A protein has these predicted regions:
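ABC family nucleotide-binding domain
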Residues: 1-153, 157-160
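Conserved beta-strand-loop-alpha-helix hinge in the C-terminal portion
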Residues: 164-192
Length: 192
């Protein structure tokens, strides 16, 4: 979907100017997605679920499996590689989803309420894992959440109300606790 106004620039590309085929290619090559409901394929084990996006890139089966196993190890699931989604807990399924998003080495990861279906302990484990990995791999994570505690871990927070940007805050959790966070309230004219 194209924006009604303004522009979207990711990695120097004006996304709003791309046609449908170019958008598909851009998403496949540069974007990873983490979903609230995991979106794992029930008939595939963890390795197959993680390897799936690599098949769309034309990567051979053995190479896909090897890479998928590397990312499952990265998220701490080396013992669950042959497990089907219904044999894993919610936290384990979400880690498979994270591995699937990361396996394509995206520049940007979009996470839609990635911990919405998890208990508080697993939420913190998953959040720390995502934060660690994206920092180590120099990736951008864009996370949608209604949980202010989760949002406080972000380096930059954009508050949206009724489809308009109403505030922008910078500084991660450490800056918030130390009182060094920068806050900007947006008025009607700035948010257009």
């Amino acid at each position: 979907e194209h924006p009604s106004k303004g522009e979207i620039v990711i990695a120097g590309k004006h996304i709003e100017k791309l046609n449908e085929k170019q958008l598909v290619t851009f998403r496949r090559e540069r974007v990873g997605f983490i979903f609230q409901s995991y979106n794992l394929i029930a008939t595939m084990d963890a390795v197959e679920n993680v390897a799936l996006p690599l098949s769309f890139r034309g990567m051979g089966k053995a190479r896909r499996a090897k890479r998928a196993k590397e990312y499952l190890k990265l998220v701490g699931l080396e013992r669950f590689m042959t497990h089907m989604p219904n044999q894993m807990s919610g936290g384990q399924q979400q880690r498979v989803g994270i591995a699937r998003a990361l396996v394509v080495n995206p520049q940007i990861i979009f996470a839609d309420e990635p911990t919405g279906n998890l208990d508080s302990k697993t939420t913190m484990e998953v959040l720390r894992l995502m934060q660690k990995i994206v920092r180590e791999q120099n990736q951008t994570l864009v996370m949608v959440t209604h949980d202010n505690n989760l949002a406080s871990y972000a380096d930059r927070r954009i508050r949206i109300m009724d489809g308009r940007i109403v505030g922008i805050e910078t500084g991660g959790r450490e800056a918030l606790y130390e009182g060094n966070a920068e806050k900007k309230e947006c008025n009607e004219n700035e948010s257009k």
